[in-house]
């Protein structure tokens, strides 16, 4: 649970930060002091952009929390990330799930092609 506390604190945080050339805006449970979770999710999004759209240049990410609640005592957060890459916008469903060790597992799914 200790590792998940920064994730919960970030829920209320409206953040704008950058990593390399990517500008992040909006609200996300992945934003935190070290952004490790955000960067892990972004790696999967980058892979999806390269595989689906042959694009390796992510310009910006805008995130929105759709829901955050506990299931069996563990947090689950659902977000939508709108990714601008190579002049196009694509949306991804991001799922964040607290595991038994207090760490966070995640899923990334392209909403539509």
Where are the language model's segments positioned?
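Cysteine-centric segments in proteins
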Residues: 17-113
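Sec-dependent bacterial lipoprotein signal peptides
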Residues: 1-17
């Amino acid at each position: 649970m200790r590792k998940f506390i920064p994730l919960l604190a970030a829920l209320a945080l409206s953040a704008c930060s950058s990593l390399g050339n990517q500008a992040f805006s909006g609200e996300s449970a992945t934003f935190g002091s070290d952004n490790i979770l955000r960067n892990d999710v972004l790696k999967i999004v980058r892979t999806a952009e390269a595989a689906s759209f042959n694009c390796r240049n992510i310009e910006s990410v805008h995130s929105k929390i759709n829901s955050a609640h506990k299931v069996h005592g563990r947090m689950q957060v659902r977000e939508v990330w709108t990714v601008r890459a190579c002049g196009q916008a694509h949306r991804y469903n991001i799922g964040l799930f607290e595991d038994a060790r207090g760490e966070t597992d995640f899923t990334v799914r392209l909403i539509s092609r």
